[in-house]
Amino acid sequence: MAAPVMDTCHVSCCANRAPNVVSWGRGGLIAFGTCNSVAIYNPEEIRVVDLLNKHTGRVNAVQWVHEPDCSPENQLISGGSDNNVIVWEKLDGKFRACAVCSGHSGPVCAVDAVSLSSSHLLVASASSDSTVKLWTYSSDAAECLQTVAFGSGFMMDVSLALLPGSRVPVLACGGDDSRVHLYVQLSGQFQRVLTLTGHEDWVRGVEWANKDGELWLASCSQDCLIRVWRLFAKTAAEPDLQTDGIIKMKENIFQVSGEEFAVTLETVLAGHENWVYGIHWQPPSVKGDSVEQSLKLLSASMDKTMILWGPEEDSGMWVEMVRVGEVGGNTLGFYGCQMSPDGSMILAHAFHGALHLWHHDSNQEWRPSVVISGHFNAVQDMSWDPEGEFIITVGSDQTTRLFTPWTRKGSSQITWHEISRPQIHGYDMQCLTMVGRFQFVSGADEKVLRVFKAPRNFVENFAHISGTSLEKLLGCNDIADLPEGASTPALGLSNKAVFQGDLASPSPQQDGGDFNSLSDQYKESYFQPLKLAEPPTEDDLLQNTLWPEVQKLYGHGFEMFCLASDCARTVVASACKASKAEHASILLWSTASWKQLQSLSCHSLTITQMAFSPNGQLLLAVSRDRTWSLWRRGNPDLDTEAMFSLYANTSKDTSVHTRIIWSCDWSADNKYFVTSSRDKKVIIWGHAVSGVAVGEGEDARVTSCSSVLDVGDSATAVSICPFLCSDHSYLLAVGLENGQILLYKWKPLEDLSSESDWSRCKDTDACQGHTMVVKRLRWRPRLGRGGHGGQDSKEEQAWVQLASAGADHVVKIFDINLSAL
């Protein structure tokens, strides 16, 4: 079998901010909504194995369709803010959208489904249009069976089951009227048979479980309580005894086809201190020829805890068995919870999208486990470190995140993980650039640039997790005077360095004295050094992996928009948003003194992206004014830094682009640069004289060297691979506004009229691409795949890696086989 041209190596993402967005299947796979996609995540391999793209709005609800025999599921239901419900089915090992249920007039917030037969599904969906719709699905077709209207009320969750001893479906709905409504299908239509009262605030979750011929219904509410109800069939011979001294719970009775069913309140569980958003029964398991349901109930709350409840064996009284949760940070609590098929792992997803996983170890203790993480808003920019061993990303979720491959001892498995969150800011992040291996500059929706440098604790942990030699890292980076870590003051935005002395200072209690000042009781530093052998948990990422801020750079009048640094890491260029020429200047900064070197003025509107040439002699800038400018470094005097002067530029009359130019990049040999624009055009520029690096010929004019490539959609990102293909052509990646990534090969030709200089190599398929704008594309600066250094070097020479960042909150890394192009 031929090697694939493009393979997805890593997907970084997190769960959407919705209560019903995560579902753990009997096959061990976790499905969750991330922006407009449904991610299929394997917790054993710790990686996303598939992304299902069909929704055009945020995915709010995901639910596996469980098989009666507890076998791995082949069907999945999702609902989104595009008002649609989609039925996914696994065919030939891949999930595909088999039916789109359209009919709601508002976002879908909850879904559930039950198998009526091997080929028929009953699907329920709740929406903010104040209705619950019932759908039937069979043979790749779905139709609306019934719409249940709730007037001005909203149903927050729905759950379907089959009545004991029958194939009659029963529907539970929990909503903002603080009640749980039960509907049963009678004569083909669902009719309300009972309303269960007791909750004193919105009901956030409902779920059925089937045990020993009885149905158990759990409901959770914003009143911080959980109620467990029991539904059973009443037998005709059952006596109605009124025994003195015995308290009997009230029975709510309804009839279906002449048979009586009763619902009683089994227990009320109080233990959470904030709204309870999610509940989940432990999945049933197969024991011999029968299916057994355990009465263990998991709950998740905004108080940052999950509780596992269950009845005591002796008394039958429901008690709290396990409580786990998140400590520290300024985050809100949990939105939902799930349990693995065998009950050995429990999962929560938090307000900011983070997944929290605990496993039951051999000592019967619950321990945190490694899980994927990602941005919970648009990813705006990213950069590889100069050695290609990690990437740093920034996003509109106000965080900067660092990802690296995790190399396990004695295992060939390599997965990428977030190992540091250098910056947690108060403004949406916009741009960054690396300045050396362990230093970067970032810009946000503020006028200030901030410079960060890695602490000693990060360098040590990076070496342990990535399998890199610590001695090698120490050799390239003088860490003798580096701080241990960083922490953020309670009311501050700047990460303050924490040194060894700050950690070692004894507390007053240790000296036997009393507190003598407020500073003893309320310390500025919350940092604790970590010695990591595996990627950190969300708690540690929030609190113990910050990088100290070493400098602030002032000079811009508006919010930052783009950054670039030269290959020698001596100069940083920055630009901000601008609607006038006076603000559309490029500021150059010295990385030695962090002083402003120069201001370069040419453009009249926002500069959207900049790139230094690989030899560091030229600076390219593209702008919203539809033009580009090229600046050349002069020869430095003995006492002054080299100054940049305008070398070439296009005007509105000479520019080939007719809309905003979004992106630009250089070829590794300095001979060409590329621009991409909203007008769907990608153009390569250089000297008409073949083989001359841009800027070397005094009389040579910079002109377009390629035919105009029309990519069919707004080209929002472009990047040239630093390595040539086997036929000595240049490899380019182009990111589009619709989320697709295209690979092209380009070869300089004398005759451009035939457009044969471009050849299309590969397009991302429906699962590989993004679902929203591609914001940034970056090639790894070295051949090979990150973390595969120990493999046969000749084999690795055939591979390059491409990282992409999208407005769909996702960061992806692709393995691209140069020999297969």
From Swiss-Prot:
Signal peptide: none annotated. Keywords: Cytoplasm, Nucleus, Repeat, tRNA processing, WD repeat. The keyword Protein biosynthesis does not apply. GO terms for cellular component: cytoplasm; elongator holoenzyme complex; nucleus. It comes from the Eukaryota. WD repeats lie at residues 14-53, 54-98, 103-145, 151-193, 198-239, 271-319, 329-368, 374-413, 424-462, 602-641, 656-695, 715-754, 769-821. One of its GO terms (biological process) is tRNA wobble uridine modification. It is found in: Cytoplasm; Nucleus. Pfam families: WD40. Its main location: cytoplasm. Component of the elongator complex which is required for multiple tRNA modifications, including mcm5U (5-methoxycarbonylmethyl uridine), mcm5s2U (5-methoxycarbonylmethyl-2-thiouridine), and ncm5U (5-carbamoylmethyl uridine). The elongator complex catalyzes the formation of carboxymethyluridine in the wobble base at position 34 in tRNAs. Belongs to the WD repeat ELP2 family. This is Elongator complex protein 2. It comes from Danio rerio (Zebrafish).
